[in-house]
Amino acid sequence: EKHCGDNYLDSTKDYDLVIKSPGIIIKDYISDKEKEKITSLTDMFLRFCPNKIVGITGTKGKSTTSSLIYHILKNNGYDVYLIGNIGVPSFNVIDKLKDETILVYELSCHQLEYVKKSPHIAILLNVYEEHLDHYTGIDAYVRCKKNIYKYLNENDYLIYGDIFKYIKQEEIDNLVAHKLSIDDNPLNIDTSK
């Protein structure tokens, strides 16, 4: 069934489940109750794919970081796919996955907007003011980015960078997941040169 026109989002009340495309802007056009029905292909993939997933997001640097992680894993003999916002849709590789396959998943704020599952390893590089044309404001944008770690458990990992202008340190500290700041320099590398 096709719904068009200014009030096309009103039809969400007629369905139990709505699969949203990342480009559709919802903002505050529908109620919170109706938003609970919304999912996405990203959410479905994260919830139902049993493989290890390394998810990368941030305002800047997602593609570079995702590509580096992919190439490091690939060059070290791992069976790995680079998927997501970088160009290959996640479900395009589903029939190629083996038990040991690792997925490096570049995730935009739009892809994270309606997820209810975090990847096994979540990387949040940074958060700056962007994409505010899509969201009601910076808080809504940050809320989407935070979904990458919101559902982590004690067996998961969060690696994070420049995020504390918009996210409280206490929120990160209270996560049950293993945490590592990019600034921690656990290898004790001399970065002054």
PLM ranges: what are they?
Residues G161-D162:
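Conserved Class I SAM-dependent methyltransferase catalytic core
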Residues D10-L17, P22-Y157, Y166-A177:
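Phosphate-binding loop of NTP-binding sites
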Residues E1-L9:
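Long, basic/Gly/Ser/Thr-rich N-terminal segments
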Residues Y8, S40, T191-K193:
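General structural signal for secondary-structure boundaries
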Residues E1, D184-K193:
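Short, intrinsically disordered, charge-balanced linker/junction segments flanking boundaries
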